From Swiss-Prot:
Induction: By salt stress or dehydration, in vascular tissues of roots, cotyledons and leaves. Not induced cold stress. Up-regulated by abscisic acid in rosette leaves. Belongs to the phospholipase D family. C2-PLD subfamily. It catalyses: a 1,2-diacyl-sn-glycero-3-phosphocholine + H2O = a 1,2-diacyl-sn-glycero-3-phosphate + choline + H(+). C2 domain is a calcium-binding fold, and the binding promotes the protein association with membranes. In PLD delta, all the calcium-coordinating acidic amino acids are conserved. The active site is at 373, 375, 380, 718, 720, 725. CDD domains: C2_plant_PLD (cd04015). Residues 1-154 form the C2 domain. Transmembrane segments: none annotated. One of its GO terms (cellular component) is plant cell papilla. Its main location: membrane. The gene is PLDDELTA. Its EC number is 3.1.4.4. A 1,2-diacyl-sn-glycero-3-phosphate binds at residues 373, 588, 718. This is Phospholipase D delta.
Length: 868
């Protein structure tokens, strides 16, 4: 799709197949360095010529290294190319050392949803003190939008408008395809007749799987209504932490846990009729299993702001308990590794200083600002006969304090029983009398081939983390580290496993889909296809290919000296483009596509997800088809809503909303529709009002919050999931923001899954499989009821019914007099007019009880990379 925005600017929406081949006659940008080299080597003219480069032979220039045997290598430019549109970088080649005739020969498949006049190819020289622009080649958007192949030499011009040298140019080959002409987007991911899942990802789609979907940490029997499915089945509500506890208890060989936070004091089982393991903490359970001979490995994010040395304890900014958990397991057979979010070891100090928003980006910033955010539990479980298999749990739930909750989301009840020693509400200072912060999340269990892909992720990260640990111990004069702790499951005959292979350089070879680890047959009505996605780079894994052509073959991106897997964003883009009826999102954050914001377009939050959602709606408006997008987010990000970081995140969020409604309103006017933008896109949050229990202790001497007095508080939406057309579910640890989607910032893991026998394509009608049951179960929790009026989310009548309930709930939530809500769903407290203008509700510019602007405020004191 190509839409004219102004005389020169067009908005392109589709895929760009691009090949950056080579450049010619680049200038020597390192002349000063070359003069220094000659000065220092003048006295050693007879020295034996050597090749001092540590460069991959594939990274030589167009003429290779034919002169290297007779002459010392001349220091010259280290060129690379960035592909940019205004306020967004679309692609970046690797750096080629010392070459004025570089041959990159790199291919890119770029998802585009950007307005621009020219596509720019900036040729840069990588330097120890930062990159220098050699020059830029520009291709007009009109030429690209034609869809014709563009191939040839394009002049590289400097800032003066002239080439730095005569005939300086870059050779480019490209072709743009509008998204509505791409066949794979027409059927939906689940309805693809080729069943290839999301294309161009590191892990392929896996067949023969089983998935169990969870809402919240626990669901008590009878608290949610029965939901009928196809074939006479009834949706079964899972008990997440109880299932995880049972799986850990029954493990025979391995328990691997990855977390942003893992707290040894939490209890997984609290409200159950089965007494088993009810009184045992997570730490006690893991020690017990390790004493049975089970290999227990914990990989926890190392928060660099927390410390426990020389008797001085600093809990850290994020309060993850990492040092406390490490200390608890220190003298046990449980191996607990704290893993910092290091940048790539291939980046030098100055290479890590370059940042879109700040030149002061020292090496420690990566480890301080960004995190390991994945949440995974891997255990061996019972398979067919006497065999064992690998089972994975992934999603948004860390095994730590504040996460246990149920669909009731109590805020004042059971604080001394169910939530004893587990009170969590960071909105208020310690000691304040306040409601607990209820926690809503999504999680899942995976059995089958995809669970082994989660295992590959763990092993790649473990090898990298223990490599850093080994280096640290050597610096301290120690020589041993238990770096061979991973179970070699391929050597244990009764543990079913595909064949894992590695190249000599340690590169992981992703195994083919192996029927030996299938847990269901393809003709089984309850069969699942599952695919694993990640946001991660070579600074956090050991096993990525070292060469560009191998990375390209594994659908990884090369960015200067990094190899990047950003398949979570790829999955979101392709799934949104493939949606046919509706999209339902729950996410802790919602911001992106900053290149199209009304203000601060250079914030760097250039993930495509919000723009893709808006353009999906636009495409349906043009086709005169119904489509609806529902987005559930927290009322405010966790913490004090008056604080600078929270206010800035809220500001980015409101900028994102405004951009989306602008796009939709403009299209409605273009087709002369009298529809309202809210007929297509709506934002919601969750809240709770609960009367004080009769046995609540007196508040004598305590600072009492208004939230406590009014008996209300938001339900914190920590979920990271998307349901499309009731046939495809995408969930994991990734937020919808730049930190989670970039691949070079927070590390994330997610899964996309569907039942091939429960799709629109297979049924010829609205499917009612497990994904449908999951969405209806979530809506039953949020809306306080279920029924036929919620079966078709794309219908305008359904959308208006949801809005009626959510708007009434907002009125009840803010009423000074206690009034119980119907469910928990609340219309997000911003108003949108027919022109798409987003503004605060009259008399409610700040959050009730706690303050802070609902629309947020920009802060000049914070780096944008922290809050985007």
């Amino acid at each position: 799709m190509a839409e004219k925005v102004s005389e020169d600017v067009m908005l392109l929406h589709g895929d760009l197949d691009l090949k950056i081949v080579k450049a010619r006659r680049l200038p020597n940008m390192d002349m000063f360095s070359e003069h220094l080299r000659r000065l220092f080597t003048a006295c050693n003219a007879c020295a034996r010529p050597t090749d001092t480069d540590d460069v991959d032979p594939r990274d030589k220039g167009e003429f290779g290294d034919k002169n290297i045997r007779s002459h010392r290598k001349v220091i010259t430019s280290d060129p690379y190319v960035t592909v940019v549109v205004p306020q967004a970088t679309l692609a970046r080649t690797r750096v080629l050392k010392n070459s004025q005739e570089p041959l990159w020969d790199e291919k890119f498949n770029i998802s585009i949803a950007h307005p621009f006049a020219y596509l720019e190819f900036q040729v840069k020289d990588d330097d120890v003190f930062g990159a220098q622009i050699i020059g830029t080649a520009k291709i007009p958007v009109r030429d690209i939008a034609s869809g014709e192949r563009i191939s040839g030499w394009f002049p590289v011009l400097g800032a003066s408008g002239k080439p730095p040298k005569a005939e300086t140019a870059i050779f480019i080959d490209m072709k743009f395809t509008p998204f509505d002409q791409i066949h794979s987007y027409r059927c939906g991911i689940a309805g693809d007749p080729e069943r290839r899942g999301v294309r161009r990802t590191y892990f392929p789609v896996r067949k023969g799987s089983q998935v169990r979907l969870y809402q919240d940490a626990h669901v008590m029997d009878g608290t949610l209504p029965a939901i009928g499915l196809d074939n006479g089945k009834v949706y079964e509500h899972g008990k997440c932490w109880e299932d995880i506890c049972y799986a850990i208890s029954e493990a025979h060989h391995m328990i691997y846990i990855v977390g942003w936070s893992i707290f040894h004091k939490i209890k997984l089982v609290r409200e159950t009729k089965v007494p088993r393991d009810k009184d045992m903490t997570l730490g006690e359970l893991l020690k017990y299993k390790s004493q049975e001979g089970v290999r227990v490995l914990l990989l926890v994010w190392d928060d660099k702001t927390s410390h426990d040395k020389f008797g001085i304890k600093t809990p850290g900014v994020m309060g993850t308990h990492d040092e406390e958990t490490r200390k608890f397991f220190k003298h046990s057979s449980v191996i607990c590794v704290l893993s910092p979010r290091y940048a790539s070891s291939k980046l030098g100090l100055f290479k890590q200083q370059a940042s879109p928003s700040s030149s002061i980006y020292i090496m420690t910033v990566v480890g301080t600002l960004f995190t390991h955010h994945q949440k995974c539990v891997l255990v061996d479980t019972q398979a067919v006969g006497n065999n064992r298999k690998v089972t994975a749990f992934i999603g948004g739930l860390d095994l730590c304090d504040g996460r246990y909750d149920t669909p009731e989301h109590r805020i004042l009840h059971d604080l001394d029983t169910v939530f004893k020693d587990d009170f969590h509400n960071p909105t208020f200072p310690a000691g304040t009398k306040a409601p607990r912060q209820p926690w809503h999340d999504l999680h899942c269990r995976i059995d089958g081939p995809a669970a082994y892909d989660v295992l590959i992720n763990f092993e790649q990260r473990w090898r990298k983390a223990t490599r850093w640990k080994e280096f640290s111990l050597r610096l301290k004069g120690k020589t041993h580290w238990q770096d061979d702790a991973l179970i070699r499951i391929g050597r244990i005959s009764w543990i079913l496993s595909p064949v894992f292979k590695f190249l000599k350089d340690g590169t992981s070879i992703i195994p083919e889909d192996d029927p030996c680890v299938w847990v269901s047959k393809e003709d089984d009505p309850e069969n699942w296809h599952v695919q694993i996605f990640r946001s991660i780079d070579s600074g956090s894994v050991k096993g990525f290919p070292k060469y560009e052509d191998e990375a390209e073959a594994q659908h990884l991106e090369c960015a200067k000296r990094l190899v990047v897997d950003k398949s979570i964003q790829t999955a979101y883009i392709q799934t949104i483009r493939s949606a046919q009826h509706f999209i339902y999102i729950e996410n802790q954050y919602f911001l992106g596509s900053s290149y199209a914001w009304p203000s601060y377009r250079d914030a760097g939050a250039d993930n495509l997800i919000p723009m893709e959602l808006a353009l999906k709606i636009v495409s349906k408006i043009r086709a005169k088809e119904r489509f609806a997008v529902y987005v559930v987010i927290p009322l405010w990000p966790e913490g004090d809503p008056k604080s600078g970081p929270v206010q800035e995140i809220l500001y980015w969020q409101s900028q994102t909303m405004q951009m989306m409604y602008d796009v939709i309103a403009k299209e409605l006017k273009a087709v002369q529709s009298d529809a309202h933008p809210l007929d297509y896109l709506n934002f919601y949050c969750l809240g709770k009002r609960e009367q004080l229990p009769d046995d609540m202790p007196a508040t004598n001497g305590s600072v009492v919050s208004d939230s406590y007095n009014f008996q209300r508080f938001m339900i914190y939406v920590h979920a990271k999931g998307m349901i499309v057309d009731d046939e495809y579910v995408l969930m994991g640890s990734a937020n919808i923001n730049q930190r989670s989607m970039a691949g070079t910032k927070d590390t994330e893991i997610a899964m996309g899954a569907y039942q091939p026998n429960h799709t629109w394509a297979h049924k010829g009608r609205h499917p009612r499989g497990q994904v449908y049951g999951y969405r209806m179960s979530l809506w039953a929790e949020h809306l306080g009821k279920t029924g036929d009026e919620f079966v078709e989310p794309s219908d305008l009548e359904c959308l208006k019914k949801v809005n009626t309930i959510s708007e009434e709930n907002w009125k009840r939530f803010i009423d000074p007099k206690f009034s119980e809500l119907q469910g928990h769903l609340i219309k997000y407290p911003l108003q949108v007019d027919v022109d798409g203008k987003v503004s605060p509700l009259p008399d409610y510019e700040t959050f009730p009880d706690v303050g802070g602007k609902i629309i947020g405020a920009h802060s000049m004191a914070l780096p944008d990379t922290l809050t985007t």
